[in-house]
Amino acid sequence: ISPFSYKLTPTAELVSPDDSDLIFRAQRSAVMPIMVVTNIFDEGFSTETLSGILSSPELQDRLIGNILAELTGKNYYGVNMDIEYIAPEDRERYNAFLERLTERLHNEGFIVMTALAPKISADQPGLLYEAHDYAAQGRIVDYIILMTYEWGYT
């Protein structure tokens, strides 16, 4: 079960959802709670907030530390990075961040996953697709969640 969501701030802090009761109930029912981190800021996904974090090793370290603190403090089993609308110029920085995050969390026994919009070609245009390196993320993280709901709402 994945409470939605921890939101990034421009200073790499996390705004927590009210998840304590849900985590308690999940664990009591032998269900693994997974933390979800998004780059939602104010009214929607923020390309700028994420870009600022990816441009700063210090902010990345702070974010990784904050994620780890929440994982251990609330007994989550891992994290799902639901990061959307990444600027194309941040593609490699995001891959490098995922590598650092995954290495650190694996050392502590946590799993890492990412959420990706499905696409029909490797060079599909659009901010939702261009900066995500699907092959690299497949190598870096433990699991990938395909957000098929991006193709329509029913």
Where do the protein language model's features map onto the residues?
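Chitinase-like catalytic core of GlcNAc-active glycosidases
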Residues: 7-154
